[in-house]
Amino acid sequence: MSKLIEYDETARHAMEVGMNKLADTVRVTLGPRGRHVVLAKAFGGPTITNDGVTVAREIDLEDPFENLGAQLVKSVATKTNDVAGDGTTTATVLAQALVKGGLRMVAAGANPVALGAGISKAADAVSEALLAVATPVAGKDAITQVATVSSRDEQIGALVGEGMNKVGTDGVVSVEESSTLDTELEFTEGVGFDKGFLSAYFVTDFDSQQAVLDDPLVLLHQEKISSLPELLPMLEKVTESGKPLLIVAEDLEGEALATLVVNSIRKTLKAVAVKSPFFGDRRKAFLEDLAIVTGGQVVNPETGLVLREVGTDVLGSARRVVVSKDDTIIVDGGGSNDAVAKRVNQLRAEIEVSDSEWDREKLQERVAKLAGGVAVIKVGAVTETALKKRKESVEDAVAAAKASIEEGIIAGGGSALVQCGAALKQLRTSLTGDEALGIDVFFEALKAPLYWIATNAGLDGAVVVDKVSGLPAGHGLNASTLGYGDLVADGVVDPVKVTRSAVLNAASVARMMLTTETAVVDKPAKTEEHDHHGHAH
C-alpha cells in the first residue's frame, strides 16, 4: 500500500489536533462531578460511561495523521490502566498539557531532545516526591475510602472494602454480572495467579478483554505441550462433554496452541490456555495446590500420567474461570473444602519447621492463596447499559484499592500533583538551557488534572489551582462538596501507584511526540481512488 508522509511542524500539528480531539472527549469525565460520554455501538444499544479508558478505546479518527496523535495518547490511558487499573483520564490530560506546552517551546526554538530529557527528569522527580508523601493503607476503612473515590459510589466502596479486608492483600476479588438487580458481595473458595492467556483469540468478553469460562473443566499439565497428537485425544473427549476447558501447563505452543485457537475461533470448543506460574519445584507445588482446589490431578509423565492416554477423570472443575492478559482467577473450584483445609494445615506445619526465611515466605504465599479464597462482587442494575457502567465502576474501584495497598495513598483531586511542583523548583536550579524549559513545561502541566476537576465541577479552574497551590500539603479542593480542607481526613484520596503511573506514562508519550520529525501513514483507499493528495477528507 502506498504511503503519505508529513514532516516537521506539519506532522506535529496534525498529531496534536488528533491528541486534542481524544483528550477533550475524555477529560469531561474527570472528577466526582465529571460528565458522561455516550458511545454508539455497531451492535446493540449505546454505552454510557465516565471511564476514561473505555472512551479512549472507542476513538479512531478519519484523518490518518490526526489518528496517530490520538492513538499515541490512547496508549497513555491503556498503559496506565494495565499497570494501575485506574487514573486513565488523569494520564490523558497530563499528556495533553505536556505536549501543548512542549510544542509551544519547540515552536519558539527549543531543542526537542533536550526538552524531552527535562520532561523525563521532572517525571522522575515528581514520582519520587509522591512516594515520599504517601500514607500507607491499612484496614477496611482506608480501602473503602479509596474504592469510594474511584467509583463515586459509597455502596461500591463499602463492598470492595469489605471484600478486600476479608480475603487479605494476597486474596482475589472478582467482579461478575448478577442475575438480579442488586449488587452484592459473596465469598467463595478459589485461587488466583499472575499469568494470563497465551493468545488474545481466547477472549470472550471484548469490553473487558477477558476470557470467561462458566462451569469449565481444568487440565493441569506439568510439562510443555507442543504436539497435537499428544493433546488431541483430550480435546475430543472435552468437546463431547460440551464444557469449556482451561489448560494450565508449563507452556502451550506450536500446533497444539494453533489448534486450540482455531477451535476457539470456530466455537467448536471454548478453551483458554495459560502458563503455570513459577519455575522448578515451586511450579510443581503450585500445580498440586491447583489440583486440590479444582479436584483434579496434575498430568505428569513422571508419575505415570501421560496426556494422550488419560481420560477426563484427571480433569478438575470450577464454577467460573476469568482470565485476562495478566492473571487468572479460578472461582469455586471443584475440590472439597476438607482437602483444601488439609493442604493449608500441611503447609502451615512446613512453615513451622522450615529453617529458610525464603522458604517460609513462599509457603506463606501459598497458604494465603489457598486460605484467602475469592471475594465475588456480583453487579446488578435495571438495564444492560446501566449494568455495564456499574461493572466498570466496580472494576476501577477494585483496581484502585489494590494499587493503594501496594504503594499507599496521597491527597486526591489533583492537589498532590500541584503541590509536588515544589520538588521541581530545586531540580530546575541544577539544569540549564532547554532541559530547564522541560521542567517549566512539566510544572505547568501538573496543574491540568486539578484544573479540569474544578472546571467539570462548575468552578473557575485557574482560580482553584491558584488557591490550592498556597494551601498546606495534603489540603485541597473536595469537588464533591465544593469546599477546601484536609483531603486525606475527608477521604478524598488517590492511590500513589495510580498517580505515579499517570505521570510517568504521560511524560513518556509527550517526549515521543515532541521528538517526532516525520509521520508516515497508509494512504486511505478513497484518497487513492480519486488520486487526491494530502489528508483524507
Swiss-Prot record:
ATP binds at residues 29-32, 86-90, 413, 494. CDD domains: GroEL. It holds the Pfam family Cpn60_TCP1. Its EC number is 5.6.1.7. The keyword Nucleotide-binding applies. It comes from the Bacteria. It catalyses: ATP + H2O + a folded polypeptide = ADP + phosphate + an unfolded polypeptide. The keyword Cell cycle does not apply. GO terms for molecular function: ATP binding; ATP-dependent protein folding chaperone; isomerase activity; unfolded protein binding. One of its GO terms (cellular component) is cytoplasm. InterPro entries: Chaperonin_Cpn60_CS (IPR018370), Cpn60/GroEL (IPR001844), Cpn60/GroEL/TCP-1 (IPR002423), GroEL-like_apical_dom_sf (IPR027409), GROEL-like_equatorial_sf (IPR027413), TCP-1-like_intermed_sf (IPR027410). Together with its co-chaperonin GroES, plays an essential role in assisting protein folding. The GroEL-GroES system forms a nano-cage that allows encapsulation of the non-native substrate proteins and provides a physical environment optimized to promote and accelerate protein folding. Forms a cylinder of 14 subunits composed of two heptameric rings stacked back-to-back. Interacts with the co-chaperonin GroES. PANTHER family: 60 KDA HEAT SHOCK PROTEIN, MITOCHONDRIAL. This is Chaperonin GroEL 1. The gene is groEL1.
